[in-house]
């Protein structure tokens, strides 16, 4: 990978910088509920798929393809007026939680079998992100608190994997997710 510069003994590649910038733009636009967020998700996810694969973070690489599919779904699902946030019923919250827990506990051992770099963290990020992304596409404000938790885990995880700028990005995502949570909660249709 082409190194753009070195910061704090860390080689920053062009690929990682482009992925970080595209991700920041896409996630910030998501807080506004505007449909233009989705093309940015496609660009950033394409870049991160390559980066994560190169670091043997296979679940994170696969997740990027899920994001691309969700971005296409979101583009058509949100329509020209953007997101109209609503809340999940308690039964729906319980179902999503159980599905998430079972998926995480099932996926981590499978990743270990194929030699992934960090199975439990990587699988948690994959499962949590898929759930949050689906809820975001479905315009549910509960997507944002899930993003807060996933981004906290991802910040720690990517720092341990020596992806420092990506770790920094996810720490910024925590703040953006809190902002998105507040904005969407105010607009949520009860």
Region spans (language model):
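Long, highly hydrophobic alpha-helical transmembrane signal-anchor segments
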Residues: 21-50
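Alpha-helical interaction segments
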Residues: 38, 57, 134-137
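Alpha-helical membrane segments and adjacent membrane-interface helices in multi-pass membrane proteins
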Residues: 41-78
């Amino acid at each position: 990978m082409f190194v753009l510069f070195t910061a704090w003994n860390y080689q920053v590649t062009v690929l990682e910088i482009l992925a970080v910038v595209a991700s920041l733009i896409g996630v910030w636009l998501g807080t506004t509920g505007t449909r233009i967020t989705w093309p940015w998700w496609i660009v950033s996810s394409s870049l991160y798929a390559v980066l994560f694969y190169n670091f043997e973070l296979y679940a994170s690489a696969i997740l990027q393809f899920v994001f691309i599919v969700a971005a296409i779904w979101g583009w058509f699902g949100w329509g020209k007026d953007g997101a109209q946030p609503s809340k999940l019923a308690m039964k729906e919250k319980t179902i999503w939680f159980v599905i998430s827990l079972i998926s995480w506990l099932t996926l981590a051992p499978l990743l270990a079998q194929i030699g992934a770099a960090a199975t439990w963290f990587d699988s948690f990020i994959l499962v949590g992100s898929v759930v949050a992304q689906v809820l975001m596409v479905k315009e549910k404000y509960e997507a944002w608190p899930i993003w807060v938790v996933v981004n906290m885990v991802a910040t720690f995880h990517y720092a341990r994997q020596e992806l420092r700028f990506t770790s920094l990005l996810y720490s910024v995502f925590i703040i953006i997710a809190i902002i998105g949570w507040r904005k969407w909660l105010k607009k949520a249709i009860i």
